[in-house]
């Protein structure tokens, strides 16, 4: 049997701080090639962005096709001297594996790799199993999963269902399965006035006043009341600034940044219209500009045979899974355009923290859940796949 702990240790020992590959995908590639997978390494780049390593590995052919998606890049470890165990040593202590990426999400990659190696050791699947792994999830997410999906489609790959190994669990492995995510829309609102002395406000035009009124217009009334699957959409102002450090100067310009996490009652286009309508009414003639960042759309994988199969695989481990759409975004936001997708991974309590770790028992539990999914998947979807 494949040793999930050894695989996780090997991955953690690769210093793959985003966007560096650090040897993690090279290790995974060698591991899967030895098991009979066809492995393709792809690098993508774009102006002003770092070049990123990506990996696609596949065994079997035809349909149904189950894809596991994940990322080998990790966030920086911070002050390494603050760690009780070095962040890239993969040390084990008190029944836990320590290291950057243990929870998010090298542990889950190791679990699916171990499950897939055990499953395919008995013969190729009646369909296909693949890995879609990027080094650009913790970064801008421009040269990673999105482009790898485009590349896979161009070569004729068709995915039927996907699992993303993000750390979704709250207390016990498998207790939470993400079947959707809220969309995310960020923007910068700039309001223009006229600089002047605070003692002579009649000679100036303070942009802070209309800015405050416009922010109140965005926040005082909810965008919706939520849905059965999603909590209500929410806007948070994240910064307000004028570039002015003096107490006696009225600034010429004031800016605010905000983010909206929105449910499936909206898409980014409809939400922009609502935002702009509120701002126009509150501005009362003030000059302003609104600049958006690239949005992420919301999505929902509705309950059906695939979600039920994943829920039953978790139940076999003695855990009742809750279906959730809470939390932040993941690369599932790209995959949902190709096939139904769920997020299922380890407990994420220590992700991105000093001394990030995962219990060894949790790695074993997740491996067993993934293996059950593989064991049931091809019989369940062999007829329904087209």
Across the structure, where does each feature detected by a protein language model lie?
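Acidic/His- and Gly-rich active-site-bordering loop/insert found
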Residues: 1-98, 121-126
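Acyl-CoA/ACP chain-elongation machinery
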Residues: 90, 136, 196
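Glycine/serine-rich anion-binding loops at beta->alpha junctions
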Residues: 95-111, 197
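Acidic/histidine-rich catalytic neighborhood of metal-dependent amide-processing enzymes
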Residues: 105-180
């Amino acid at each position: 049997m494949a040793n999930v702990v050894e695989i996780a240790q090997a991955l953690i020992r690769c210093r793959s701080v985003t966007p560096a590959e650090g040897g993690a995908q090279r290790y995974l590639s060698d591991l899967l090639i030895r098991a009979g997978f066809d492995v393709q390494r792809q690098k993508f780049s774009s102006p002003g962005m770092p070049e990123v390593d990506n990996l696609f590995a596949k065994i079997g052919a035809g349909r149904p096709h189950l894809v596991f998606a994940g990322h080998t890049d990790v966030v920086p470890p911070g002050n390494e001297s603050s760690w009780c165990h070095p962040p890239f040593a993969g040390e084990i202590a008190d029944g836990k594996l320590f290291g950057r990426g243990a929870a998010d999400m090298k542990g889950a990659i190791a679990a699916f790799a171990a499950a897939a190696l055990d499953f395919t050791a008995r013969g190729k699947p009646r369909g296909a199993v693949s890995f879609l792994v990027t080094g650009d999830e913790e970064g801008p997410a421009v040269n990673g999963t999105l482009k790898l999906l485009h590349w896979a489609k161009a070569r004729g790959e068709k995915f039927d269902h996907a699992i993303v190994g993000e750390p979704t669990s709250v207390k016990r492995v498998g207790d939470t399965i993400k079947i959707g995510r809220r969309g995310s829309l960020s923007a910068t609102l700039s309001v223009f006035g006229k600089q002047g002395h605070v003692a002579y406000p009649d000679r100036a035009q303070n942009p802070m006043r209309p800015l405050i009124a416009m922010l109140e217009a965005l926040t005082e009334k909810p965008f919706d009341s939520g849905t059965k699957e999603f909590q209500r959409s929410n806007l948070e102002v994240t910064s307000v600034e004028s570039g002015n450090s003096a107490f006696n100067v009225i600034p010429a310009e004031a800016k605010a940044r905000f983010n909206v996490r929105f449910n499936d009652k909206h898409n980014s286009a409809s939400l922009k219209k609502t935002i702009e309508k509120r701002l126009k009414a509150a501005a009362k003639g003030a000059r302003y500009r609104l600049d958006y960042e690239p949005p992420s759309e919301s999505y929902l994988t509705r309950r059906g045979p695939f979600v039920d199969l994943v829920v039953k695989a978790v139940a076999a481990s003695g855990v009742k899974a809750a279906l959730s759409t809470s939390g932040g975004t993941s690369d599932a936001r790209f995959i949902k355009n190709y096939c139904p997708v769920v997020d299922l991974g380890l407990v994420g309590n220590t992700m991105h923290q000093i001394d990030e770790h995962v219990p060894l028992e949790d790695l074993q539990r997740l491996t067993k859940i993934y293996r059950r999914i593989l064991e049931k998947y091809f019989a369940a979807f062999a007829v329904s796949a087209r």
